[in-house]
Amino acid sequence: MSSALSQASPTAPRFSVLSWPQVRRLDAILCESVPIHGRGNFPTLSCRPRDLVQVVRSRLEQKGILVHNVRLNGSAASYVLHHDSGLGYKDLDLIFMVDLKGPDAFQVVKHAVLNCLLDFLPSGVNKEKITPMTLKEAYVQKLVKVCTESDRWSLISLSNNSGKNMELKFVDSLRRQFEFSVDSFQIILDSMLMFSQCSENPMSQSFHPTVTGESMYGDFEEAMDHLRNRIIATRNPEEIRGGGLLKYCNLLVRGFRPKSEVDMKTMQRYMCSRYFIDFPDIREQQRKLKCYLQDHFVGMEDKRYDYLMTLHQVVNESTVCLMGHERRQTLALIASLAVHVLSEQNHPQAVPTFTCYYQPAPYIGEVNYNSYYFTPVQPLMSCSHSYQTWLPCCN
């Protein structure tokens, strides 16, 4: 097995101290006001991530929930470390490392976070009759609880109409904390939070807190090299959940490439298998793909077609765990979504020639396919992939 998929060296340093430019980018993210949009008549809350983290941490500790540290995770952490990686960032993933051993710990965390939102309501709002359930319905986009032998964590995602959600994750234990090396970074925020509370002087190059980053991949410098050079690498790809396939294709569209042909084939087979294990039902696949397109291509809608074509190619080449009917069904779903986003982009008028295919397969009606669809004979976007620029009829 190649080096990118090999086990981490026990001596490889997983931590690194951030430079001054990186600390400045981190401070800008933590101090930027992020709106939390309310449903119905509830007002929009405006809060800085730094303030929200401090309030949540204080409230949890008052309730007896020990917070070991708070971290910035995901694409925002990658952006702080290397702002020109091509990944960008949308969600703010904030991890609270906590103890969730008690029988009521999950419920205590949820109520503590929801009650914190009261602090950010505009002045003049009567808070006395607002319950945690009301706040959940008004401001929470997603609520997740996982409690297994290896994983104990919960997630509260706060609503933002532009897709820039603040996601608060409360982790007691989590077996797999990353998918690829380029999204394996976590930045420990405790020193930044302490500095903002205690220092009367602003940060400068000669006077700023020491901030530490960690790569869950295992080797910080190797992961940074992958981020700078847009390399896709991972460890133990068989552990990656079904959503890893969607993230992998997103990286491909953004110009990232596997380190080697062997890595690519190994990763793709594992990820396709896991995708169909986690999402066996065609309707669940449709829902997942639509949500992914909506959440991860804000401001990049023109990339959705290229993304779906890439996903179609990977599934077509690397799926080995399905019956032929199931495989064709999934490929037809991806093809249908690709045509749909293409029509939304109003490209058909610019296409000089197109071919019309008829799809009489009986399962097509199950996911609201149109009977006819068109696909361009010539490629509409410059793309480095070698796959066909049209999608054949799947009967």
UniProtKB/Swiss-Prot annotation:
<dbReference type="GO" id="GO:0045727">
    <property type="term" value="P:positive regulation of translation"/>
</dbReference>
<dbReference type="GO" id="GO:0045786">
    <property type="term" value="P:negative regulation of cell cycle"/>
</dbReference>
<dbReference type="Pfam" id="PF07984">
    <property type="entry name" value="NTP_transf_7"/>
</dbReference>
<keyword id="KW-0808">Transferase</keyword>
<dbReference type="GO" id="GO:0005634">
    <property type="term" value="C:nucleus"/>
</dbReference>
<comment type="function">
    <text>Catalyzes the transfer of one adenosine molecule from an ATP to an mRNA poly(A) tail bearing a 3'-OH terminal group in an ATP hydrolysis-dependent manner and participates in cytoplasmic polyadenylation. May be involved in maintaining the translation efficiency of at least some genes through preventing degradation of their mRNAs.</text>
</comment>
<keyword id="KW-0963">Cytoplasm</keyword>
<dbReference type="GO" id="GO:0043066">
    <property type="term" value="P:negative regulation of apoptotic process"/>
</dbReference>
<dbReference type="GO" id="GO:0008285">
    <property type="term" value="P:negative regulation of cell population proliferation"/>
</dbReference>
<comment type="similarity">
    <text>Belongs to the TENT family.</text>
</comment>
<dbReference type="GO" id="GO:0005737">
    <property type="term" value="C:cytoplasm"/>
</dbReference>
<dbReference type="InterPro" id="IPR012937">
    <property type="entry name" value="TET5"/>
</dbReference>
<dbReference type="GO" id="GO:1990817">
    <property type="term" value="F:poly(A) RNA polymerase activity"/>
</dbReference>
<keyword id="KW-0539">Nucleus</keyword>
<protein>
    <recommendedName>
        <fullName>Terminal nucleotidyltransferase 5B</fullName>
        <ecNumber>2.7.7.19</ecNumber>
    </recommendedName>
</protein>
